[in-house]
Each structure stands twice: as structure tokens, then as C-alpha cells.
């Protein structure tokens, strides 16, 4: 029974780790979509950010420098999407898909040119990554039934980006419902002509939303390659941007709903990962691939 309880807690712990980039990207998508901009480019921004974060961390031996570089490139891609879809009034879906295709090809091409490892970056040393944060007295309290075990196995041991992702949900909810910017953001997505007649720039509001989305996508990409992983590999996002987009829609474009959807997708992936090679009743050993 104790082993079953521990396995359950480890699965919840893995759920939080797997769901972190989904949460960050889903919050980014909410900002974009609330402003009236369809942001299919979440996948591309996260992929490019993951590569840049790993590359800069390799060159500077600093995960923090890699994250800031990742945020910068994600903002640039967001502004590129804004230029095509807001200023030039192009098709937003095509613009987003173009960024995804650009990121997919550019990360491999530049990666091969820089590191000659088939589009990958060298493995990052422990000091070049975001390290887990052990909370005070985690080991000492771990022996306490239920509460102590939860504190040690689930709450403690996450890196800073996991906590930032959870904080991003509160930030998004606060910005959308408690600030003047959030009111304008929702208005520009629902009735842009009304906001324009009130003297507020629709384009400026949408660009600000894309910048915030770029910051969140940049952190999601940096998490994949410098926190959850130890470097960049080709197509390492593996469709997580699209999953985050689906989670946002599943959550009805609300931060709380999107969070629950991301945790659900993360839980399913964590369960699938932990069941690999495990003997199951009536089924046998779960396949590895």
C-alpha cells in the first residue's frame, strides 16, 4: 500500500513537470486569443526558444542567460506574427503555420552549423541548467505520513520555472479580470471598433498581448531544454504547442480551465511514461514505444 501511495505521488510530481511548458504556452495563447489574434505559432515559438536557450546556455554556461535569450527570440517571432496578421492584415493561421515551419527548419540548420551534432546541442552540465529547489526540511518532514510525503515528493524538488508556470496562471487571471489592460484586451478581441472609437489603439493592445505571449513561450522553451532536459534535440517540442492550444480551447479560454486541461494532459503523459515496461493485469507488459 505504501509503495502504491509513493508511485501515485511520483506520478503527480511528474505531472507537474510535464505540464509546465503546456501551462506557460496555454497562458500565452489566452493573451493572444483574447486580443483577437489566433496564435497557431505557439509551437514554433516554443521550439525556437528551446534551441536558443540551450545554445546560449552552452556558450555562456548560464541557464539564466539562455532563458532571457529564449524570451527575446520568442518576442521577435511574436512581433513577426503581429506584423503579418495585425499590420499587414494577413491570414493569422497561415502566418502562425509559417512561423512553425520556419522554426522547425531553422533550429536544425543553425544547430548543425554551430555544433555539428545533427541539429542537437551539446549536453548541458548540471551548473548550466535550472536546478531543482529543495524546500526547507523536505527530508526531515518526509517521514511524516501523507503530509510529509506530499511535501517531500510533490511540492519540493521543482525548479524555478515550474513555480513561475503556476504563478503565470494567477498572473493571467489577475491581468484579465482586475486591470484596465485586461479590460481593454477583452474588448479588443470582442468589439475592436468600440475600443477604437474610445481612442485606444487596437493594434498597440494586440502587440502588447503578443509580447506577453512571447515572454511566456520563451520560458516554456527554455524549460524544455535547460530545466526538464539537458540540451536541445530536433523537434523536441513534439507538438506541445498544439496541445497547449487544445488545452486553452478545452478550458474555454479561461486560465483556470486551461490549467486543469494542461494538468490532465500532463497526467496522461506521466502515466504513460511510468507504465512503460510495467506488467499490467490482463494486458501484460506495457510497450516502451
Give the role of each language-model region.
Residues 153-232, 255-256, 260:
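Helix-loop-helix "hairpin" substructures at the membrane interface of multi-pass membrane proteins
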Residues 31, 55, 59, 79, ...:
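Membrane-interface helix caps of multi-pass small-molecule transporters
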Residues 1-11, 140, 146-149:
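Short, strongly hydrophobic alpha-helical membrane anchors
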Residues 227-289:
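Transmembrane alpha-helical segments in multi-pass inner-membrane proteins
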Residues 104-177, 279-289:
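Transmembrane helix-bundle core of multi-pass membrane transporters
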Residues 34-38, 77-141, 178-180, 238-239, ...:
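Short loop segments and helix-boundary regions at transmembrane helix junctions
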Residues 25-26, 50-54, 104-108, 162-174, ...:
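Hydrophobic core segments of alpha-helical transmembrane domains in multi-pass membrane transport
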Residues 10-93, 97, 249-253:
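Single transmembrane alpha-helix segments in multi-pass membrane proteins
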